[in-house]
């Protein structure tokens, strides 16, 4: 009777251990996949991410927003000329150089509006170049080797009793659910950022039309800061995912396996939280509202 019970116990242990190893291997593979996906998506410029959306947004901007920007530009430059004249002692101290100055500022303003898309895309090209260089380093340094990380875990697990193995199997299954949640968080943050990028770029001509005016120019400068914040948010996303991969890489299963699993769970929850903070951190760095 004991022989039969031992065989059942051994079979059940093997089943649980293989399930735990499979869950953890799947987790590490999922992390490698998410790091690669994050690098591929956040390192893409708006025109390369989805050509159809990009062309639609550009068409809306050029045909709908640019005429409005032209009206705003006309109003601002008229106001600028009036302020220039009034500032010179209410026209008593008149200087013809003012007109040349006003013409130059008007020319610069028109240049900003007509080259809006070149300016906006240049910002994202710079950010994309930074992310591309960083992703090459991050992916190479943070790739998780499941075989190396799991090591001799299988032998250690086989030495455990059925009860603790059930607990570890449940915890490792929970890790699979958290890996799925992590995928959702990365999807929301990355794709939400791209949609926000398209929304911000669609109205680019309006803030660009205000760049040369002292009072209204804050709108344009803040818009440029917002663009840089959006662009470099991609770099912060890469940093967050890379830190997570390194933390998981540093978890040692040689001691308490349960503690290692819960540590990994904690890191996963922490990553989900920090991913949603990347936008506010980027805006804080570039002082964008």
Where are these regions (language model features)?
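Alpha-helical transmembrane segments and their helix-start/interface "positive-inside/aromatic belt" motifs
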Residues: 1, 8-23, 94-112, 116, ...
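Binding/recognition "hotspot" determinant
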Residues: 1-72
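Long, low-complexity, intrinsically disordered extramembrane tails
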Residues: 1-2, 283-289
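Non-cytosolic segments of integral membrane proteins
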Residues: 16, 24, 31, 107-203, ...
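Hydrophobic, aromatic-rich alpha-helical transmembrane segments
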Residues: 60-64, 95-99, 103, 165, ...
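Juxtamembrane "helix exit" motif at the C-terminal ends of alpha-helical transmembrane segments
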Residues: 70, 74-86, 237-252
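Hydrophobic transmembrane alpha-helix segments characteristic of membrane transport
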Residues: 72-110, 203-217
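Alpha-helical transmembrane segments
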Residues: 208-225, 253, 284-287
């Amino acid at each position: 009777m004991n022989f039969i019970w031992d065989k059942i116990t051994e079979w059940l242990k093997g089943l649980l251990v293989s399930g735990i190893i499979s869950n953890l291997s799947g987790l590490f593979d999922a992390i490698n996949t998410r790091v690669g996906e994050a690098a591929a998506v956040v390192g893409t410029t708006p025109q390369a991410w989805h050509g159809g959306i990009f062309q639609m947004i550009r068409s809306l901007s050029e045909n709908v927003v640019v005429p409005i920007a032209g009206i705003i530009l006309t109003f601002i430059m008229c106001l600028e000329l009036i302020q220039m004249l009034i500032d010179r002692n209410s026209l008593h101290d008149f200087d013809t150089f003012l007109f040349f100055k006003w013409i130059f500022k008007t020319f610069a303003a028109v240049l900003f509006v007509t080259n809006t898309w070149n300016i906006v895309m240049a910002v994202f090209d710079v950010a994309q170049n930074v992310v591309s260089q960083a992703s090459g380093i991050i992916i190479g340094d943070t790739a998780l080797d499941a075989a190396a990380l799991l090591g001799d875990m299988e032998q250690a697990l086989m030495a455990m009793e059925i009860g603790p193995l059930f607990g570890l199997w449940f915890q490792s299954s929970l890790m699979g659910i958290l890996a799925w949640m992590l995928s959702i968080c990365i999807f929301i943050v990355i794709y939400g950022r791209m949609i926000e990028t398209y929304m911000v770029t669609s109205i680019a001509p309006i803030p660009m039309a205000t760049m040369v005016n002292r009072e209204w120019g804050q709108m344009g400068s803040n818009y440029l800061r917002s663009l840089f914040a959006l662009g470099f948010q991609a770099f912060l996303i890469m940093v967050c995912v890379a830190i997570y991969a390194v933390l998981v890489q540093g978890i040692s299963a040689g001691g308490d396996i349960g503690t290692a699993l819960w540590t990994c769970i904690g890191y996963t929850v922490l990553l989900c939280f920090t991913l949603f903070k990347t936008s506010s951190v980027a805006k804080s760095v570039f002082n964008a509202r």
